């Protein structure tokens, strides 16, 4: 089969299924996975699909500003997987930061049932509410002008308060993870400034990113891979992603 014919067939498959895996395409067309990755990159450069780790999807490339609550039910299995990994990392007497993200809400839902004595700093109102009946968890809510769409304050006052904390571990959601240029991004300017401030005030930084965040960019950068110690995701990344992260000494947890 000629390359052009294979590319057409790949497009037919992805238009039907909305998502394809490199492994499956390699077996179907009896070519190497490396060849399929080149095919997917060709199609991506033509604007016909978007690569993800392990395959490709038909999806726009920009992360967009959406209600936090609406994201809670997207990829719940992946978010819960990440949340369980996070709770395993949190230790007795840790001071942690959970920023505004649907994954942070999943983390809080698990943490509230543990016996760990910890301090949780957050700017997400629903995270605070999760700990109402958890006497072992001290909760500090960052104040400021409340963003109703996101569900918490993200402005100058919130940023100023974060500068006063000594955080052991920060768990930060990312709207996009760009492995080609090694940066993290988000879709709200003020929130991106806040995330950057958290990175500067934490001893260990953990980025939370499920499968859809790879090869996807928000409008505003908030950090580089070199600012991060760990990236927690819901599936094992492919070699390309792992190599980009390992080059910047980021440890991948999945």
Can you describe what each PLM-predicted range is?
Residues 59-61, 101, 142, 174-175:
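Generic beta-structure capping elements
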Residues 119-120, 169:
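A residue-level structural signature of the nucleotidyltransferase/glycosyltransferase Rossmann-like core
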Residues 2-5, 9-23, 28, 34-100, ...:
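HTH-adjacent hinge/linker in prokaryotic transcriptional regulators
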Residues 102, 125-126, 236:
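Alpha-helix/helix-capping structural signal
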Residues 105:
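Glycine-rich SAM-binding Motif I of class I
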Residues 2, 12, 21-25, 30, ...:
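Conserved phosphate- and dinucleotide-binding cores of soluble alpha/beta proteins
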């Amino acid at each position: 089969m000629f390359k052009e014919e294979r590319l057409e067939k790949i497009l037919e498959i992805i238009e039907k299924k909305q998502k394809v895996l490199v492994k499956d395409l390699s077996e179907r067309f009896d070519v190497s996975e490396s060849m399929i990755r080149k095919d997917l990159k060709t199609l991506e450069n033509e604007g016909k699909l978007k690569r993800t780790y392990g395959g490709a999807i038909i999806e726009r490339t920009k992360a967009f500003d959406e209600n936090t609550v609406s994201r809670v039910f997207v990829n719940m299995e992946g978010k819960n997987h990440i949340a369980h990994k996070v709770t395993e990392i949190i230790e007795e007497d840790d001071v942690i930061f959970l920023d505004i993200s649907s994954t942070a809400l999943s983390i809080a839902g698990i943490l509230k049932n543990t016996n760990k004595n910890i301090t949780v700093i957050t700017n997400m109102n629903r995270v605070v509410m999760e700990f109402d009946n958890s006497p072992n968890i001290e909760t500090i809510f960052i104040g400021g002008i409340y963003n109703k769409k996101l569900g918490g304050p993200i402005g100058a006052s919130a940023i100023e308060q974060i500068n006063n904390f000594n955080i052991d571990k920060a768990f930060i959601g990312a709207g996009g993870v760009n492995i080609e240029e090694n940066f993290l991004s988000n879709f709200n300017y003020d929130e991106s400034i806040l995330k950057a401030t958290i990175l500067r005030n934490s001893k260990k930084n953990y980025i939370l990113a499920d499968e859809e965040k790879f090869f996807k960019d928000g409008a505003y950068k908030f950090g580089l891979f070199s600012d991060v110690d760990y990236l927690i995701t819901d599936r094992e990344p492919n070699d390309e992603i792992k190599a980009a992260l390992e080059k910047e000494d980021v440890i991948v947890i999945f």
